[in-house]
């Protein structure tokens, strides 16, 4: 297309050739979110588990085969020589989520009911079971009886909300509202016992991948190559293989050759590599070297192998090599044949299982093993850098699917073991086998429930369990919920001060949000996904393998090792499948097929030209992201495609999947990204075409859809994050999760333990484009406040702010706070159960000192009751048996078990829910609401990590005002700006001013061409000072302020930390039982700790009496009687006024001393360990003298 064509009018014939603009890219992004939503990675992963993985696990399990233990019965001659029972599991079925009431009725379960009634949102799982009884006669004929049990119930599987088996799947907004659900709720979590649980993605190193690391010297080894090998089908724990090259100098100081040794699974010592080759059946040195070096002219590499060849010179055939390995196995003292068989088994089944575990895999294994050594040698020769542990291409994420898959596999195996045991018992005792009894559905039901409820992944109290995999979904704000659903965790110990894994790595660009990570010990280990990342669910490798076969891949049987250096090695999911002579054509074809969706779109194709490798990935857990495809410096997507996208009637036709299918967009994973050339903006692409001389690259292959999509959920809410110092964006990402807003639209129908709702939330005047996809406009969390930056009176020093009291009275940042209390009537035995009701002081023991007046006769406070600290809101009693109280019938017949309000809170009873739980027992939730009005000490923040507390509130008359009569709502100290460099806040302020004036929203999306100058000019046009300064007048005196004040609307957030929840003091109060020191914490009405540092200051001051008062009198003073002779604690009976020390038979020389109770406890604990701490109350010498006199 020529230059002049560019500027021709729209109705040209070449209309379809018109290029799109960066603005049009947002239409594409909208299409993505419309189709995918924000938690697609969770849903797809779970669906994969339900639809494929579960069936695979059941199919994988071998038949249960049982032979009766024959009881020797001499007189009785049986009809059959032997009987074999076989049980196997077939097709599985999952129904919609159901619940069984206590009376046995079943009904469809909806999430709302599960939340309110503390049920688990799970669906029953059924399986077809076939039982075969094979009877062998004495004459060798067989009789088989087959019995089919269809749809046997084997357990309940928790269902992820909005996944394809959920009752809410593909419901319209209207239906969702009628079901009491929030239409904006994204799903992606589970409901376990009424609480919402998220599975956090777990990061791990990718399996079947050769890594070579250089060891820090001095070390026994110079280089280590490792492969975590895991077969696709069997999900056994991966077997790791290490190949290590020893350092030149051994630990003793003598120079040993650089031997190379390998670790094999279940073998105690390291085995020289040459012996492994010989055990695989490659005996001649030439054959072995061919599998490692490929090229005999490479003398350097051959030389490195010399020591290893010499080391293994003594072993020259396969049997001896196998015996060498077998000798070092687990079992000791078996025959040679057994050892050889054992070694063969290990080489076949346990070594590199992903290459193959069948009979004739030796060639493939030898080649792969040779490849590992080849890589190790390349690294040792310095021809190739060591691998990077933190590269994101080497990482995989375990989402809900794989996590639940591993758990289900374990539980299903346990179930089959139990079935086997039960059937064996039945058969041995000659009973009939009833499969309904044999299959304990509780195994799977409670196993899955336990792991999801506690977050301990794996069996209860077993080793190798991971903690914190499932977490309670954060429902503070809508953004915090979304962010929690897109979080991922690296299971590295939090204590390790390792910097490397925590740093932002180049390969994380576009995959992980650079700003959103917690501060403190988990920094950089807990990450969040960027907006458009998709995590692959994995697809089968066989279509790829078939394709490679057709397109001229040569496998190991057909090739001679000499050709390997010239050809390109081909790997599929880390397994070396063969070589190819024309990789360029192969890659082009693969990509073409992928763009036509003939090959799954999530397949990754990585061509490493320098290494002559082509790596193809189809596995699960790779991060990938969509990019525009560029060919000949032009985007494949054109203006007309954008128009069809915008004009479509229904969301089903066209849309995102259509763009992918047409080959305009493709998903690129982290590793493939390094083989592409990506243009940052559409504009860069146009520039590269117009003047190729200045272009960064003349072969762009892809183009970013929009650079701002590298940010995650919380960082996408920040306006102009590209104008802030980077840690500020991190702080805001953390605070945005604590801002009050409307966390979900159906909060009236929910009984959350804690909930905060802002009275009058506003959408921000200054927005980012990504916000509309995060539904921040529908569910905002803040208010556009008029903010002045000024020192006014000095009550805004050190990050505090001055707030306008009149604005507060009008409802500025007023919020609701809900807290729910729950209780249930538990069964105490078979007959006795607890009862809700108003306790009667006459007959109930252990009643609280709070007020019981607010309760109705049913034991519940009715809605609309005003309650304050310690008032009882749920009355509950338990009957007590009459015979205690030492025989005499006590006047009490019941014991009090009521729930009272937290003592520091007041409010109104908002809603009471009385229902039954899964066991049919009555159970109640009471929600109390209170209004929180901003006051001194409450915490607020802007969207730029500028947090502050209210230092003072002034009424409107006392606030400064502008000529137009505007008074600010908030005054921030100017010292908050320079050192923190949050220029974004200043730009937001003047843009907000323009936006308010023109009645539009300001666009503050990062990496766009908005400049401060443009905004300033627009502000000037509106008739203001162009940099946002205003003349103001002092509210106290009415005089004009000498400085110009920077003023304008800025979006502020109210954070959940409020002074009413924190204020705490104590005069007297409860003490701990063990140490008799004051309790700890506000909730227990505890004391304030006078710690070691405070103690040191008092010592430095020399304030001895004060020190004694704090650490002794006010803490745990205690009086104890001590024997003067031996210095141990004596017995004192103060009633009878008698004292004695039995050890010394001393009844007179006894004194009383004052020591801390904790000290007395320590002394007694020492005595229990047979160490006698003696308290000598007078001089030792004197005591001896007296003893002499006494004698």
From Swiss-Prot:
GO terms for molecular function: DNA binding; DNA-directed RNA polymerase activity; ribonucleoside binding; zinc ion binding. Keywords: DNA-directed RNA polymerase, Magnesium, Metal-binding, Nucleotidyltransferase, Nucleus, Transcription, Transferase, Zinc, Zinc-finger. It catalyses: RNA(n) + a ribonucleoside 5'-triphosphate = RNA(n+1) + diphosphate. Pfam families: RNA_pol_Rpb2_1, RNA_pol_Rpb2_2, RNA_pol_Rpb2_3, RNA_pol_Rpb2_4, RNA_pol_Rpb2_5, RNA_pol_Rpb2_6, RNA_pol_Rpb2_7. PROSITE patterns: RNA_POL_BETA (PS01166). It is found in: Nucleus. InterPro entries: DNA-dir_RNA_pol_su2, DNA-dir_RNAP_su2_dom, DNA-dir_RNAP_su2_hyb_sf, RNA_pol_bsu_CS, RNA_pol_bsu_protrusion, RNA_pol_Rpb2_2, RNA_pol_Rpb2_2_sf, RNA_pol_Rpb2_3. Residues 842-903 are annotated as: Disordered. A zinc finger (C4-type) spans 1123-1144. Belongs to the RNA polymerase beta chain family. The binding of ribonucleoside triphosphate to the RNA polymerase II transcribing complex probably involves a two-step mechanism. The initial binding seems to occur at the entry (E) site and involves a magnesium ion coordinated by three conserved aspartate residues of the two largest RNA Pol II subunits. This is DNA-directed RNA polymerase II subunit RPB2. It comes from Solanum lycopersicum (Tomato). The lineage of its organism: Eukaryota, Viridiplantae, Streptophyta, Embryophyta, Tracheophyta. The gene is RPB2.
